[in-house]
């Protein structure tokens, strides 16, 4: 994990390049096995360096350290947006996460992971049936609908 000072220097450089962007700095402390105090220290440095918001992430499933971080962070910076990424602590609903201090919630990889499972199911269907008809009917969006959302003028062919 990069030192907090080195990362803060990069944030200062980004901030000096433009005031017309929002910078959200992610602290990896809890992912890297550090404690809440380290995460708070890093967040403080990142805000001082020009970050507009803080992203906090954790590999723990109970949410305990995320919620403790959020409570302490919001006491110090009530107006700074705080972003949660509940990949591992996925049993908490949005209302609960907001009550614990999240201003923004990012479901970072759930759609990619679910797409992978759907691709495996489609591939197995094609291999098992020797054709794609069943996969098309059960696992695939129609070509027409895909074209409609990606290139509206060509959807009349399907």
For the regions a language model picked out, list residue spans one by one.
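Alpha/beta enzyme core
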Residues: 1-87, 91-106, 114-120, 124, ...
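Extended, intrinsically disordered, low-complexity segments
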Residues: 110-158
